[in-house]
Amino acid sequence: MLDLFADAEPWQEPLAAGAVILRRFAFNAAEQLIRDINDVASQSPFRQMVTPGGYTMSVAMTNCGHLGWTTHRQGYLYSPIDPQTNKPWPAMPQSFHNLCQRAATAAGYPDFQPDACLINRYAPGAKLSLHQDKDEPDLRAPIVSVSLGLPAIFQFGGLKRNDPLKRLLLEHGDVVVWGGESRLFYHGIQPLKAGFHPLTIDCRYNLTFRQAGKKE
């Protein structure tokens, strides 16, 4: 697939109060990020988690950092232990941490201290239903979301599930940061369309950085 914007400089696209898309912000770091994704997955493999209601998610997931997001019969939680390996989640790669902090600073959140990174792998047809990120103890900390590989349609709404949605194309290297007034806005990913990307072949990766523990 020919990238007509391969030489373009990153630019910012306002999304909502406290939210911005940093177009192509992760483009130059992508190859190292993908190598590090593979390294994390070699220690804590991708898996399709089951929701408390018994639904198997279409997105394959793993984590790195001090805490990892996972599902349980009683709900959703952050845990320092991977329930599949019974070992701590892999450490967050330096490339992840550096990119996340640069993106957060560019978006106006210079004090963000990520301690959890959820890695999602989307195959064609996989999606993420509308949801809020509300399992974190300090909702003043933003969310940083990095797109790699195949393009996807990102849905971004409001504080209510039935609020009007913005639908935006996220491409390889784009980073979305939201916090402040939009921290609890509903968001999701529409079913991924089949395609080819030279770095990820037939899939899309998403890195979601959060501050899941107490700030030091």
Swiss-Prot record:
Cofactor(s) this protein requires: Fe(2+)
Cofactor comment: Binds 1 Fe(2+) ion per subunit.
Effect of D135A: Abolishes activity towards single-stranded DNA containing 1-methyladenine. Alters substrate specificity, so that the enzyme gains activity towards single-stranded DNA containing 1-methylguanine
Result of altering R161A: No effect on enzyme activity. Decreases affinity for damaged DNA
Single Gene Ontology BP annotation: oxidative demethylation
Keywords, in A-Z order: Dioxygenase, DNA damage, DNA repair, Iron, Metal-binding, Oxidoreductase
Top enzyme category: oxidoreductase
One of the record's GO cellular component terms: cytoplasm
Enzyme Commission (EC) number: 1.14.11.33
Positions of Fe cation binding: H131, D133, H187
SUPFAM superfamilies assigned: Clavaminate synthase-like
UniProt cross-references to PROSITE patterns, sorted A to Z: FE2OG_OXY
A GO term for molecular function: oxidative RNA demethylase activity
Phenotypic consequence of W69A: Abolishes activity towards single-stranded DNA containing 1-methyladenine
Binding site for substrate: W69, Y76, L77, Y78, D135, R161
Binding site for 2-oxoglutarate: N120, R121, Y122, R204, Y205, N206, L207, T208, F209, R210
Catalytic activities: a methylated nucleobase within DNA + 2-oxoglutarate + O2 = a nucleobase within DNA + formaldehyde + succinate + CO2
Top-level taxon of origin: Bacteria
Domain Fe2OG dioxygenase: 113-213
Function of the protein: Dioxygenase that repairs alkylated DNA and RNA containing 3-methylcytosine or 1-methyladenine by oxidative demethylation. Has highest activity towards 3-methylcytosine. Has lower activity towards alkylated DNA containing ethenoadenine, and no detectable activity towards 1-methylguanine or 3-methylthymine. Accepts double-stranded and single-stranded substrates. Requires molecular oxygen, alpha-ketoglutarate and iron. Provides extensive resistance to alkylating agents such as MMS and DMS (SN2 agents), but not to MMNG and MNU (SN1 agents).
Family (UniProt): Belongs to the alkB family.
Protein name, UniProt field: Alpha-ketoglutarate-dependent dioxygenase AlkB
Species this protein is from: Escherichia coli (strain K12)
